[in-house]
Swiss-Prot record:
Annotated function: Plays an inhibitory role on natural killer (NK) cells and T-cell functions upon binding to their non-MHC ligands. May mediate missing self recognition by binding to a highly conserved site on classical cadherins, enabling it to monitor expression of E-cadherin/CDH1, N-cadherin/CDH2 and R-cadherin/CDH4 on target cells.
GO cellular component: intracellular membrane-bounded organelle; plasma membrane
Name of the molecule in the record: Killer cell lectin-like receptor subfamily G member 1
UniProt GO molecular function: carbohydrate binding
Species the sequence originates in: Rattus norvegicus (Rat)
Gene from which this protein is expressed: Klrg1
Amino acid sequence: MADNSIYSTLELPAAPRVQDDSRWKVKAVLHRPCVSYLVMVALGLLTVILMSLLLYQRTLCCGSKGFMCSQCSRCPNLWMRNGSHCYYFSMEKRDWNSSLKFCADKGSHLLTFPDNQGVNLFQEYVGEDFYWIGLRDIDGWRWEDGPALSLSILSNSVVQKCGTIHRCGLHASSCEVALQWICEKVLP
């Protein structure tokens, strides 16, 4: 019987060669300094940005004095700054004399408007609440720092000898009434 076998030559691809890892190690070593360099550049930029922000903040705080300013004048905690003045709006209520003493103890005084400027701004801010201010009736309405009141004040009783500010303007009140108050401090 004849042998019907078919033979074929099988050509298999050669086994993959193991690549030399040393080439990859060299590239990895070369990339490490680049990463370190990028980190250094990023940290340097961050430092420059932060220093610029500090300089900008100091310039805002000290005005045109820049670094000549030995210490920026700041308002105490819980006080609001407007220009060269700090203002404290109390949350608690006291009579006029206790409010006056509170402000004096903080190196300030009850809010005054000796030149009648700023009344409208504060009227808008205080809204419906009444706040003690540095105004009282002793032989006529006078501000605590001396000048006579040249604005009108609403009063409905002769016993109302202390001034308040309200959304609707200046009002007289009995000095014994417990109200909130506004202290004012001029920055050096």
